[in-house]
């Protein structure tokens, strides 16, 4: 049993600064900044872990990356909080429902409050969306129940895709306007039927959820997964992508070697960020695997296909 610690967060990286005028997210894109971050990665004894429940990294004044403590939940997912002029969007809500152990609502309220102190608004909305509907990405949804000016969109395919304007035409790319900061949304089934990829032109980030990340790529639908990777490769050929960001790290820095499932200590992690080349590497691996079931390790990821 892990000991209970007082809820705390750590903010590293950029400092939130600004004024009261609308931010022009097109005039000065925030691409090309460093993501050389030492992420919290658990400890040999989860009971004695002293890391914050949530680590927060400010990539810039309007873009925050959160990681859940591995001692709280072994999945240690990454979450993303993006600010626009009219509203912020939180992508995913982590793997733990209880605010006592995973104070996501409190953390987000604090971060939104800091942003609004620097950029006052009469009214400001929080939108909660998901990369897909697996439990380690939606568990914290309930913490936002009753929060004023907040919309939590269900993560199931029917609800999420309808909200984003996605549907039967999987090649269709839709947009989500946060107030001058526009995200592009792509249906991305394969790992999960409801998966969505988001692209933020301001940072150049492509948020791929569990479709592509430095770890075990679990495939639910082989044909859909292949087609999704094809679409993502084509998409990145016409966009300025600075980093591809998934929601987990499961590999070690030794090529082809991943950490054991349910580990709570990963001291030798590779970076979270990937280049668009990783998408092409995954696509080449799909051709090599050719639908064969089982576990197929590659240097930077493992394809896991068990229909």
Predicted segments with their positions:
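N-terminal amphipathic/basic-hydrophobic helices that include classical n-h-c signal peptides
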Residues: 1-16
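Accessory terminal helices/loops
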Residues: 13-49, 230-307
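Active-site HxH/HxHxD metal-binding segment of metal-dependent hydrolases
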Residues: 26-27, 31-32, 95-181
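A short catalytic or substrate-binding loop motif that flags glycine-/basic-rich loops and adjacent residues
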Residues: 48, 72-75, 189-191
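Conserved beta-strand hairpin/beta-sheet module of binuclear metal-dependent hydrolase folds
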Residues: 52-117, 198-211
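Short, hydrophobic/aromatic-rich segments at coil-to-beta transitions
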Residues: 60-65, 173, 182-184
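Metallo-beta-lactamase
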Residues: 88, 95-97, 102, 184-187, ...
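Active-site-proximal loop/helix segment associated with metal-binding centers of metalloenzymes
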Residues: 153-169, 195, 215, 267-291
């Amino acid at each position: 049993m892990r000991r209970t610690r007082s809820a705390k967060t750590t903010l590293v990286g950029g400092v939130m600064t600004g004024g009261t005028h609308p931010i022009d997210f097109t005039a000065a894109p925030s691409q090309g900044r460093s993501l050389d971050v030492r992420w919290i990665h658990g400890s040999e004894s989860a009971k004695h872990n002293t890391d914050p429940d949530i680590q927060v990294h400010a990539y810039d004044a309007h873009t925050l990356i959160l990681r859940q403590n591995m001692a709280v939940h072994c999945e240690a997912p990454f979450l993303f909080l993006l600010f626009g002029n009219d509203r912020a969007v939180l992508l995913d809500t982590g793997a733990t429902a209880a605010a006592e152990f995973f104070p996501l609502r409190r953390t987000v309220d604090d971060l939104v409050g800091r942003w609004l102190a620097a950029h006052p608004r009469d009214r400001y909305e929080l939108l909660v969306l998901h990369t897909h509907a697996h439990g380690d990405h939606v568990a914290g949804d309930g913490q936002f129940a009753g929060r004023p000016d907040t919309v939590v969109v269900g993560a199931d395919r029917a609800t999420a895709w309808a909200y984003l304007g996605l549907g039967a035409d999987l090649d269709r790319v839709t947009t989500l306007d946060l107030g001058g900061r526009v995200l592009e949304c792509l249906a991305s089934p394969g790992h999960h039927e409801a998966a969505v990829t988001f692209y933020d032109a301001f940072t150049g980030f492509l948020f791929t959820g569990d479709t592509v990340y430095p770890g075990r790529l679990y495939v639910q639908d082989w044909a859909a997964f292949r087609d999704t990777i094809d679409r993502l490769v084509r998409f990145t050929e016409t966009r300025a992508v600075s980093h591809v960001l998934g929601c987990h790290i499961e590999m070690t820095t030794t090529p082809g070697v991943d950490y054991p499932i349910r580990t709570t200590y990963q001291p030798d992690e590779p970076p979270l960020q990937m280049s668009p080349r990783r998408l092409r590497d995954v696509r080449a691996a799909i051709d090599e695997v050719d639908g064969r079931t089982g576990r197929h390790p590659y240097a930077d990821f493992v394809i896991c296909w068990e229909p």
